[in-house]
Design a protein with these regions (language model features):
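Catalytic Walker B motif of ABC-type/P-loop ATPase nucleotide-binding domains
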Residues: 71-74
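Conserved ABC ATPase signature
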Residues: 46-50, 54
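Conserved ABC ATPase "signature" region
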Residues: 12, 23-42
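C-terminal boundary and immediately downstream tail of ABC-type ATPase nucleotide-binding domains
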Residues: 134-156
């Protein structure tokens, strides 16, 4: 997020600059997306006034405001306080139920199992196994996948 802009400005700037939307249209779309992620009441707040989870949700609203075909998430919860992880995962789960295509790099295995149509398990930067969530989480074929899932899922 741009620290010199409030939440609303962060969600309208790209729309007006890149998509050439007028201010009123950009504001309407931004407010709709901020509402989707539970951040509409923070439109006047600056990023410094928000928690990590709130910043992440504003960033999601900003991205949605650009009408993407695909939304990419690279470890969206890795830098968050553990208490804030749930609010971001809930937001992403709600987006998944809208049919939005998302590519998510995550170590949140329960979340991945619950929302994924397809799962790719990577080991040392190489695809080790891919399939449906059931293929990977219930019937993994590769020893490395089984080992990782056992270690991660039994830890929680």
């Amino acid at each position: 997020l741009f620290n010199n802009m409030n939440v609303l400005e962060n969600c309208t700037s790209g729309q007006m600059t890149v998509l050439k939307r007028n201010k009123e249209e950009a504001k309407k779309i931004a407010l709709e997306n901020l509402e989707k992620v539970g951040m509409a009441r923070f439109i006047d707040a600056k990023p410094a006034q928000l928690s990590g989870g709130q910043k992440q949700r504003v960033a999601i609203a900003r991205a949605l405001s650009m009408d993407p075909d695909v939304l990419l998430f690279d470890e969206p919860t890795s830098a968050l306080d553990p208490e804030m992880v749930g609010e971001v995962l809930k937001t992403m789960k709600n987006l998944a139920h809208t049919g939005l295509t998302m590519v998510i790099v995550t170590h949140e295995m329960e979340f991945a199992r619950d929302v994924s149509d397809r799962v790719i398990f990577m080991d040392k930067g190489v695809i080790a196994e891919e399939g449906t969530a059931e293929d990977i989480f219930v019937h993994p074929k590769e020893a490395r996948t089984k080992e990782f899932l056992h270690r991660i899922l039994t830890k929680n």
